[in-house]
């Protein structure tokens, strides 16, 4: 498992421009990520997803996020997420640790 404090820095640098994590957070260019773990792709209430995201049908968890965050457009062809991915394994683990902590109570 990664380091949530390091993951927070990665989130701020690479994700916060488009995403929020707080329970009352607003959608930005990307969806609010509160409740991410255990939710199916394309299911954040009130966010307009591509058909590719809605039909992917996987449930977000550590393993699926680990693979997705390496190369989002390869994992979900047709996603509108304009992020190249995080190639370093330890950075993905840190980010996932932060997301797990910050997107649930």
Curated annotation (Swiss-Prot):
Keywords: Acetylation, Electron transport, Heme, Iron, Metal-binding, Mitochondrion, Respiratory chain, Transport
Subcellular location: Mitochondrion intermembrane space
GO cellular component entries: mitochondrial intermembrane space
Keyword Secreted in annotation: no
Residue sites binding heme c per the record: 15, 18-19, 81
Family: Belongs to the cytochrome c family.
Protein name listed in UniProt: Cytochrome c, somatic A
């Amino acid at each position: 498992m990664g380091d949530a404090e390091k993951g927070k820095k990665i989130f701020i640098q690479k994700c916060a421009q488009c995403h929020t994590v707080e329970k009352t957070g607003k959608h930005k260019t990307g969806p609010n990520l509160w409740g991410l773990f255990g939710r199916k792709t394309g299911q954040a209430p009130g966010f307009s997803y591509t058909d590719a995201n809605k039909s992917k049908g996987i449930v977000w968890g550590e393993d699926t996020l680990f693979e997705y965050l390496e190369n989002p457009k390869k994992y979900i062809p047709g996603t509108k997420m304009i992020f190249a991915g995080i190639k370093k394994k330890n950075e993905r683990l840190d980010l996932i640790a932060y997301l797990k902590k910050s997107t649930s109570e």
